[in-house]
């Protein structure tokens, strides 16, 4: 059964802190939809339709195990599989790249540039899922820091 964290976040508006010093925690989305290993693909697809482009897969203690992307679901469909018959564990990316909340945003910019990642799960020191951050969150933070003209 999917779980949903109950806190909300967005980039802090009006902050003029230097972008180079901003942390992932300041701009990450804390409201995260997650799934478990046995969550079916059609349930995950429903979450994605609600605006979540990737769904982290966690264990009972919210430890990050993997992530299912829109692409993963499309590959399953292209293979002729019914999403209602496919478990997250069958299509997810295991041990996805993740980042800690204290990491500075320029570090994440390098990750996004060097990879095809669009979203990165945010985990604490025990690999517990605490948020997710997307490319657009980083861009929003950059603009809110007043760096658009730089």
Where are the regions that the model predicts?
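Tandem CBS (Cystathionine beta-synthase) repeat/Bateman regulatory domains
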Residues: 1-150
């Amino acid at each position: 059964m999917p779980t949903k964290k109950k806190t909300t976040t967005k980039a802090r508006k009006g902050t003029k802190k230097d972008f180079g010093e901003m942390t992932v925690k300041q701009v990450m989305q804390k409201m995260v939809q997650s799934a478990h290993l046995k969550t079916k693909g059609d349930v995950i697809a429903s979450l994605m339709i609600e605006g979540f482009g990737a769904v982290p897969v966690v264990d009972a203690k919210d430890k990050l195990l993997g992530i299912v992307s829109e692409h993963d679901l499309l590959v399953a469909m292209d293979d002729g599989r019914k999403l209602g018959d496919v478990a997250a564990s069958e299509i997810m990316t295991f041990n996805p790249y993740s980042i800690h909340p204290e990491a500075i945003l320029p570090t994440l910019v390098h990750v996004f540039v060097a990879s095809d990642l669009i979203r990165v799960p945010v985990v604490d020191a025990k690999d517990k899922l605490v948020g997710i951050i997307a490319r657009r969150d980083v861009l929003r933070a950059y603009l809110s820091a007043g760096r658009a003209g730089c």
